[in-house]
């Protein structure tokens, strides 16, 4: 098999927990490279960076993770191939399998910030920790467009709000489940258009969440009363829940 020469895409997390009010950082020892680094790994075929960052963190640390704000993307070369690693701040959440030493990662340590930076083998990883620690506490608020819907010109229904997703759109809605779950989304709001409701229903089903119907946030609702629609959006933002 010919050796790949294309770009390498990877994703990772600066994984944090608190101890007596102080942040601790997860650092990992890789015996093959004999180095200390942060949780990260290559994307699987067809995978996006968000899902890969969470998957690699669970696989390498045994801790499930909630992603926070994105951090700087690292870019460097490996064997003359360009590599990009997308990072997020991450915090632990219950449900991980726990860490088991293995041939890929044989040691895991939770260290105070300064000690973690000193332990890491690459200065660029220390820069990521400094960036992560400097981020404010945030709550995710995701604005999501519906997945692929039937073309307006092909739809024969009485009202456009009943225009459905295509088969590809329905598949994309299922793939969004893991993306939304990575941010621990708990409340789901949707326009009352069928294509929007069907985009979020797979996630809502898995998360055991009720989808709140929001007519003002539909295409037609906004067109009829932009001021009321924006006011409703502000109310949802003010709720403060992910």
Mark where each language-model region is.
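Short coil/turn segments at beta-strand junctions that form active-site/ligand-binding loops
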Residues: 22-23, 139, 184-186, 240-242
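Active-site-adjacent alpha-helix immediately C-terminal to a catalytic or transition-state-stabilizing loop
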Residues: 228-242
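N-terminal strand-loop-strand
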Residues: 2-38, 141-146
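Active-site-proximal alpha-helix that buttresses catalytic centers in soluble enzyme cores
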Residues: 41, 138-227
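Conserved Nudix-box catalytic region and its N-terminal flanking loop in Nudix hydrolases
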Residues: 21-64, 154-163
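Nudix hydrolase/Nudix homology domain
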Residues: 34-35, 97-151, 155-157, 240
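A generic secondary-structure signal
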Residues: 131, 175-182, 232-235
């Amino acid at each position: 098999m010919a050796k790949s020469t294309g770009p390498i895409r990877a994703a990772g997390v600066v994984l944090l927990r608190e101890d007596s009010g102080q942040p601790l950082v997860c650092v990992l020892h890789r015996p093959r490279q004999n180095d200390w680094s942060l949780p990260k790994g290559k994307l699987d075929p067809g995978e996006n960076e968000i899902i890969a960052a969470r998957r690699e963190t669970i696989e390498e640390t045994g801790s499930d993770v909630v992603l926070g704000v994105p951090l700087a993307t690292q870019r460097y070369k490996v064997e003359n191939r360009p590599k990009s690693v997308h990072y997020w701040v991450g915090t632990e959440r219950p449900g991980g399998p726990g860490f088991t030493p293995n041939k890929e990662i044989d040691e895991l340590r939770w260290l105070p910030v300064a000690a973690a930076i000193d332990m890491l083998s690459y200065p660029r990883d220390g820069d990521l920790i400094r960036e992560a620690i400097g981020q404010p506490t945030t709550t995710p608020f995701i604005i999501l467009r519906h997945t692929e819907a039937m073309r307006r010109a092909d739809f024969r229904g009485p009202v456009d709000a009943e225009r459905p997703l295509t088969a590809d759109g329905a598949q994309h809605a299922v793939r969004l489940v893991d993306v939304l779950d990575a941010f621990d989304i708990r409340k789901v709001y949707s326009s009352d258009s069928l294509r929007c409701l069907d985009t979020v229903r797979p996630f809502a089903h898995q998360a055991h969440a009720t989808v709140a119907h929001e007519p003002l946030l539909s295409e037609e609702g906004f067109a009829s009363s932009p001021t009321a629609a924006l006011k409703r959006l502000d109310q949802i933002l003010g709720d403060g829940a992910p």
